[in-house]
Swiss-Prot record:
It catalyses: N-succinyl-L-glutamate + H2O = L-glutamate + succinate. Zn(2+) binds at H53, E56, H148. This is Succinylglutamate desuccinylase. GO terms for biological process: arginine catabolic process to glutamate; arginine catabolic process to succinate. Keywords: Arginine metabolism, Hydrolase, Metal-binding, Zinc. Its EC number is 3.5.1.96. HAMAP family: Arg_catab_AstE. The gene is astE. It is an enzyme of class 3 (hydrolase). It comes from the Bacteria.
Length: 325
């Protein structure tokens, strides 16, 4: 059996590109992309992706263990499954990305950039996901969980971001995030160029980006911290009932504004080490620059993904408001 992660790290593409066993058939679609289809009927088609940012290793390790357990029959495959390691070159070098953030390349975003290995990869991943869903059972419900870890610490360590879509968010998706003991869920207010927005908007999948702690090198992750999300992913693959939640109720936030860096003098009014979900009160200055300041207009708001070092014209953070319980 070819190991999923090893095939990427060693750049050794499997000799057999497809095959089957007693339970399912499998086909390698690309480097770090494999499709598994059970012999019996199924009601769900699920994409699990990690490594869109190459230094976010814990989710990659989770997918490797799931891959091994499915092939060893210690995890029963009762759904059609596409496993994706997103950015092989960045995974091999331990970098977030090589030239440009791949999670801003989807929904055709790669077309606005100079061609590179990563733009080509983003385009192919879009194609693989579309083909995966189109070739699956027409009545199967579609899901996509894109797994990440964050650059900075967070007051709410684990959270999901749901793309802004026209259709209502799927109840099973929301229930699975709750069962995974995530601390929070964030609802976007505008379209994006993320992998999960692509699968939601272009493939009609119930999709989410999951942030599961902080990025660490391979071998330095404490996977015991990811037991809850791992359990839920395995339950989804086996198509079994979701487990109960074991934490305080999940908190819900909505994005009310994006902070855009427009000028060279742009500054955020918080320390560089400030965690995600840092709090601002009404009247607080969140960010300053010559052309526009950002001030908290609500009683309490929080900031997500603050980054003063982005290029001009890019998002330097999200302003969140907590939704009523």
């Amino acid at each position: 059996m070819t190991h999923f992660l090893h095939s990427v790290l060693s750049q050794q593409f499997p000799h057999a590109l497809q095959g089957e066993n007693h339970n399912f058939s499998w086909q390698w679609q690309d480097e770090g992309v494999i499709c598994l289809t059970p012999h019996h009927g199924y009601e769900k088609s699920i994409v699990l992706s990690a490594g869109i940012h190459g230094n976010e290793t814990a989710p990659i390790e989770l997918l490797e263990h799931i891959y091994q357990d499915v092939f060893q029959a210690s995890l029963t495959l009762n759904v059609r499954l596409l496993l994706v390691l997103g950015n092989p070159n960045a995974i091999r070098t331990g970098q977030r990305y090589i030239e440009y953030d791949m999670n801003r390349m989807f929904c055709g975003g790669y077309q606005q950039l100079e061609p590179s290995v990563e733009t080509q990869r983003a385009e192919r991943l879009e194609q693989h996901v579309q083909i995966f869903f189109e070739q699956g059972c027409s009545t199967a419900k579609r899901y996509h969980y894109d797994l990440h870890t964050a650059i900075r610490a967070s007051l709410l360590p684990t959270f999901a971001l749901l793309p802004h879509l026209e259709h209502v968010h799927d109840p099973l998706l929301l229930n699975s995030l709750n069962a995974a003991d995530l601390d929070a869920v964030v609802f976007h207010n505008t379209a994006g160029k993320t992998f999960s927005h692509f699968s939601g908007a272009y493939c009609q999948a119930a999709s989410a980006t999951l942030e599961l702690g902080q990025a660490k090198p391979f071998g330095q992750n404490d996977l015991s911290q990811f037991v809850a999300i791992d359990r839920v992913l395995r339950v989804l693959i086996a198509d079994e009932a979701l487990p109960s939640r074991h934490k305080t109720p999940i908190r819900r936030f909505k994005v009310i504004e994006s902070i855009l860096k427009k000028d060279d003098d742009f500054q955020l009014n918080l320390k560089s080490s400030a965690p995600n979900f840092s709090l601002f009160h009404q009247g607080d200055v969140i960010a300053t620059q010559q052309s526009q300041n950002y001030i908290a207009h609500e009683h309490e708001v929080r900031i997500l993904f603050p980054n003063v070092n982005v290029a001009k014209g890019l998002r330097a953070g999200l302003i969140l408001q907590e939704m009523s319980k």
